[in-house]
Amino acid sequence: MDDDYLSSIFEKYLHARKIFKNKEVLRHSYTPKELPHRHKQIDDLAHILVPVLRGETPSNVFVYGKTGTGKTVTVKFVTEELKKISQKYNIPVEVIYINCEIIDTHYRVLARIVNHFKEESGIEVPLVGWPTDEVYAKLKEVIDAKERFVIIVLDEIDKLIKKSGDDILYSLTRINSELSKAKVSIIGISNDLKFKEYLDARVLSSLSEEEVVFPPYDANQLRDILMQRAKEAFYEGVLDDAVVPLCAALAAREHGDARRALDLLRVAGEIAEREGASKVTERHVWKAQEKIEQDTMEEVIKTLPLHSKVLLYAIVMLDENGELPANTGEVYSIYKMLCDSLDVEPLTQRRVSDLINELDMLGIINAKVVSKGRYGRTKEIRLNVTPYMVKNIYRHDEQVRPLLTLSLSRQRRLF
């Protein structure tokens, strides 16, 4: 392949009709100047945080709602506005945003807070290695260096608590009694409405929190959000009239998920751009839906526990051998062989039956209970994804990669 050929490819895409004016507007991380259909939640948060402007410590806040209901973007919007107006009144406010899906241990959260002040304090905590008590002592030292309000936003806090326990919340909710100058308050963001059930009584008693709930968007509200973003994201005239309503309708089926709606619109635009199309059409939206679902499914399979991955591969092998639908017993016998080949202790058939139900709920397989007359009822198990997809994922997974070398007929001969 010569340089001229590569150059011509880049030239072709460079001079194709541009679809996007500013694609970043469609990213989840973008904070718009206006948030349609979230005025009540903005008012609620502003009312809870306004004591800062009077020099008083605000209550802790827990923000609840399903994925894509505007929780994170609204919290960022309100805290950014609070920082702006606090400067007008000469009230020092620091907002520390922490994504607990990534920063997911007690130690790492404390380290992230300390390191927020590293330019001011000259103190930087490594990602691992210090005793947690020492990190907490440094946290108090850097926060309390001057009079100020520190608002700590813990996004996806439920994931942090489920993984690492609630000690971090206990520490942060009691920290004000150990500070002389600064004041700390917490905003927790959770997809799990039952989040507080995971908390110890001692944490609950020290929280003194308020709650703000974000309901799902309906199709009309999603359409308004997309129309607002589309004006900034796309050049005029490149979107067919049906594109935004279709993206909104598809996302409304996914419990009113604005993130899904934005992803659909962005990916549809990317597909149109790649094709060299002059317009984004409904066809591009349907292709985007297909791609997003495939990407989502791949991510689900990648994050399955080991035994679920082995079980799924047993079903893949049966599918490739033309033996689906299969019943639980047939799948279990292959699963046991695969466990043996990996030198892993197999689970009981009853537990594997539960895992089959979980894979069914995730949409990876279909496990339908059917009646066999006098032989009773049994599950008929089918694969909902391609064997190629599963194998491609397992190729990059050291735990289950050895399964790719096995053949069903040979495994049966060995057993």
From Swiss-Prot:
Record keywords: ATP-binding, DNA replication, Nucleotide-binding
InterPro entries in the record: AAA+_ATPase, AAA_16, Cdc6_C, Cdc6_lid, ORC1/CDC6, Orc1/Cdc6_arc, P-loop_NTPase, WH-like_DNA-bd_sf
UniProt superkingdom: Archaea
GO annotation terms (biological process): DNA replication
UniProt: ATP binding residues: 69-73, 217, 229
Keyword NADP belongs to the record: no
Record's keyword annotation contains Nucleotide-binding: yes
GO terms for MF: ATP binding; ATP hydrolysis activity
Function statement: Involved in regulation of DNA replication.
PANTHER family named in the record: CELL DIVISION CONTROL PROTEIN 6-RELATED, ORC1-TYPE DNA REPLICATION PROTEIN
Family as reported in the entry's similarity comment: Belongs to the CDC6/cdc18 family.
HAMAP family documented for this protein: ORC1_type_DNA_replic_protein (MF_01407)
Protein name according to UniProt: ORC1-type DNA replication protein
Organism phylogeny: Archaea, Methanobacteriati, Methanobacteriota, Thermococci, Thermococcales
Primary gene name: cdc6
